[in-house]
């Protein structure tokens, strides 16, 4: 008899290894792995067509890793999660934190509702070496400039947590009554332009680790020099492997950031500053949400027309 079901809400963390939310959920009797395509809260920040295609492939890869047990939904996560915990013997809901302002506002509301329903709710750090509130200047204010943030903040901060492995044992459930298929989310392009991209990428957790190893062996040693020489082959290697591939895999969470960062920090201090750019973005946006469309420095008050 099912008495203890934990929901693991996948968002930007479509992997099994080094996934704190999944590891915590796996401590319960049963795990209900869930993905919700949020059509209510993103507003103008809905992913574009290429991102949707990548998401489509990532969801299929994740579902395969879970033995076909991923329950997929579309709509307002607040309503969907409330419905799930009412219909099933759910005792806990776990997720890894997202740091977009709209995501944080949504998650706070959802956590409040679920707690009022008597559900244990835990959010975890599954994407950053340090939380936004952990790296601050001596006066307690957040950093605005990357170099001091990295040199004084990151390099003097407490060591990041050790990476987690995949849960060794999980009893997975599926919400067969109301779940959708990945294909039903209508994420694939209406025209088959994705066929020209697909041969060049292996999407999913396995492909992300392959891309990381490729960067370490073929791009890392040349990154400091190659990133500044756009006319040279080194630049193309570094950009394709490090910038384009890693940013997409980080976005869908197939490449676990704490694990990859720790590995790369050991290998090369020169490139470790570069791989911290995504961290400073996630740290500054929650503090200054206006950075999405407005400068943080008052020395340059003009509108950012290039974003319009």
Where are these regions (language model features)?
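Intrinsically disordered, low-complexity regulatory segments enriched
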Residues: 14, 59, 135-138, 198, ...
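Glycine/tryptophan-enriched, flexible segments
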Residues: 119, 142-296, 300
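Acidic/His metal-coordination segments adjacent to aromatic residues that form catalytic metal sites
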Residues: 302-308
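Trp/Phe/Arg-rich N-terminal binding region typifying the photolyase-homology
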Residues: 1-160, 264
């Amino acid at each position: 008899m099912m008495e203890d079901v934990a929901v693991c809400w996948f968002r930007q963390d479509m992997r099994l290894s080094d996934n704190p939310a999944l590891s915590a959920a796996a401590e319960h009797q049963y795990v209900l792995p869930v993905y919700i395509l949020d059509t209510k809260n993103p507003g103008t920040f809905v992913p574009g067509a290429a991102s949707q295609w990548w998401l489509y492939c990532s969801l299929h890869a994740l579902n395969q890793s879970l033995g076909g047990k991923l329950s997929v939904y579309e709509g307002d996560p607040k309503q969907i999660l409330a419905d799930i915990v009412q219909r099933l013997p759910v005792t806990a809901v776990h997720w890894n934190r997202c740091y977009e302002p709209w995501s944080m506002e949504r998650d706070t509301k959802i956590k409040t509702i679920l707690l009022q329903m008597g559900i244990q709710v835990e959010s975890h750090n599954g994407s950053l070496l340090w939380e936004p509130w952990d790296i601050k200047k001596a006066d307690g204010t957040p950093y605005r400039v990357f170099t001091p943030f990295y040199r004084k903040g990151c390099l003097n901060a407490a060591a990041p947590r050790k990476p987690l492995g995949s849960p060794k044992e999980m009893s997975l459930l599926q919400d067969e009554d109301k779940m959708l298929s990945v294909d039903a989310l209508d994420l694939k392009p209406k025209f088959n332009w994705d066929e020209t991209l697909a041969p060049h990428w292996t999407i999913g957790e396995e492909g992300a680790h392959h891309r990381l190893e490729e960067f370490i062996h073929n791009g890392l040693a040349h990154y400091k020099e190659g990133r500044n020489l756009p006319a040279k082959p080194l630049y193309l290697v570094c950009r394709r492997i490090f910038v384009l591939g890693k940013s997409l895999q980080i976005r869908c969470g197939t490449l676990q950031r704490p694990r990859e960062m720790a590995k790369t920090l050991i290998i090369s201090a020169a490139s470790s500053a570069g791989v911290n750019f995504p961290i400073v973005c996630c740290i500054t946006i929650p503090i200054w949400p206006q950075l999405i469309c407005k400068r943080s420095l008052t020395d340059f008050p003009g509108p950012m027309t290039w974003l319009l």
